[in-house]
Amino acid sequence: MSTQHIYLIKHGETEENLQGIHQGRAVGGRLSEHGRADMQQVGACLATAGVAVDQMLVSPMSRGRESAELLAAALTPADVRVDERLAAKDSGHLGGQPRELAAAKAARHGVPIHRLRTPGGESSEDVQARYVDLWDEVCSGARRTTVLVGHGGGIACLLLWLTGNGFDRYLQHVPGSAGITWVEFGGLTPRIRLMNATPAELPGLLDARTAR
């Protein structure tokens, strides 16, 4: 089996991030000037390292699609598609609200925050299930290099699963805006080459000998 390269990239910083708002699916989000610059830098670094993208799968949220457009301008992927499994967490009525409200609600109900599910919404375990489902599909396919443009919570959930950690380690696996993880998969066990690297770190971590 040939080695696959899978890049997990969180969308760039949004105006809503700057306001401390939990966006979820309730708020599509618009990239800040800094967020756009970060995504352009990530795309340029990957292109300079010689990464040839066979497919780019993208969250349907506007912040994800805007980020993907900036990446695609540098990487010219052969195939770009929206995949609903990469969507942000459906937080129900908590979407668009200050982040601390979810923690307060979980405490009132006496449940771990990753199991909190608002009416009609999702828990973090639900998000993990769909991200893992997409991961399995990508790994079973023939594409050599795939970029997944998603959200911090979903990427953290997937990283917990890949590393065998529980949700008590969730916060340690959440990427910053435009954070990038690079995973090689060529057998039974994935190899994480980079985890949640920042755009500023990338030039010293990627080169044409190692990134493809």
Regions found by a protein language model. Give the residues of each.
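Short active-site segment of divalent metal-dependent hydrolases/proteases
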Residues: 14, 154-155
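Acidic, low-complexity terminal tails and accessory targeting/binding regions
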Residues: 1-5, 48-49, 77, 89-100, ...
